[in-house]
Amino acid sequence: MNLRELQLRPFRLTLRTPLQRAGSGHRERNGLLVTLIDDESQVGYGEATPLVEFGTEDLAATTSLLNELAHRLAHHPLPLTGEDVEELLASLPELTDAPAARCGLESALLDLAAQRAGLPLAKFLSASARASIPVSALLSASEPEDLAREALASIREGFRVVKVKVAARILSDDAKRLIAVRRAVGDEVKIRIDANGAWTESEAATALRGLSPLKLELCEQPVPAANHAALRRLRWQVRCPIAADESVSFPGARDLLLDGEDGPVADVVVLKPMVLGGLLPSLRLARRADALGVGYYVTSSLDGVVARLGAAHLAAAVPKADWASGLAVGQLFEKDTGLDPCPPRQGEIQLPVQPGLGLAANWSRT
């Protein structure tokens, strides 16, 4: 089976409400839909949506590289196994520094390979993949009252974990927001927070100690990404579990995060396929973390439905599902890149049973 054509379609996703994070915010996401068509007209889908602040290339580099590969890979034999996909991508060294481009191309290749194998992508990645995954709700409101209403609505929809962005305002204001959420959802619902690396070590320790009565599930990236020593120290200074997010984005840091001479620096690692270069590198990292007793879960990078669907298959294929994945973000966009075949319901995503990603060959923007 050979590749007949690689198509690229640019898209823009506009957020209904700008999502504030410490130091910046997001109003829109721009990316490329990657479509591979083989010589029997079978279609595989991928998505490349760079996130430069997490260490990916920019959109111009993504576009240039994938356009170049569209010509180079024309009529190239298509891989049949995950190992074959890895081998093909390894033969393209220019993808090493372009994780978003690699993710988009890898997804489309895996989609085709899984379809030919007659397996849903999750089962193609792991024979023991689960049929469904738990997901968290990302809350986007700013004011305590609005945040509480949003949290309560999420719980009524069946979510058991909610996530709140913090550190974009003074600690006392964040405390009021989180107290409002806890009062709204009760004690049984888990609350995780994300500081996006905006606190100093001292600020993080003060904040997490002060917030301890709220029994937070975890804190994502409390200190800057490069400060691994502070992440490790915080694990012993506070009761709240510490998750490495941006810190995982840089390839040279992953060995230090998990295999440093003093052991792992965080309790949990966050797996963003768009940042890590695809599903296969993310799956390897999850298995490595699992062997070391480090937790992990999969999140989107505010991606479109194709990337989120691939990430959901990954979340079903990783060894454990102890932590809810952060993939319930489609409702944040005014319009997605197309219909979502498996939107969250009752706090879970049920994976498609069709071979591959689970998108029809004529899937398109609606």
Across the structure, where does each feature detected by a protein language model lie?
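N-terminal capping/lid subdomain adjacent to the active-site entrance of alpha/beta enzymes
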Residues: 1-191, 196-205, 209-213, 237, ...
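Short loop/turn motifs at secondary-structure junctions
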Residues: 2, 158-160, 215-218, 264-265, ...
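Structural signal for conserved beta-strand scaffold positions within catalytic alpha/beta enzyme cores
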Residues: 10, 137, 270, 326-327
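Intrinsically disordered, low-complexity coil segments
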Residues: 71-86, 251-266, 320
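Flexible, glycine/charged-enriched surface loops at secondary-structure junctions
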Residues: 79-85, 121-124, 218-222, 299-301, ...
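Buried hydrophobic packing segments
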Residues: 105, 109-113, 285, 308-315
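Catalytic core of soluble alpha/beta enzymes
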Residues: 164, 169-309, 335-337, 342-344
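Active-site pocket-lining/capping segments in soluble small-molecule metabolic enzymes
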Residues: 299-341, 345-346, 354-356
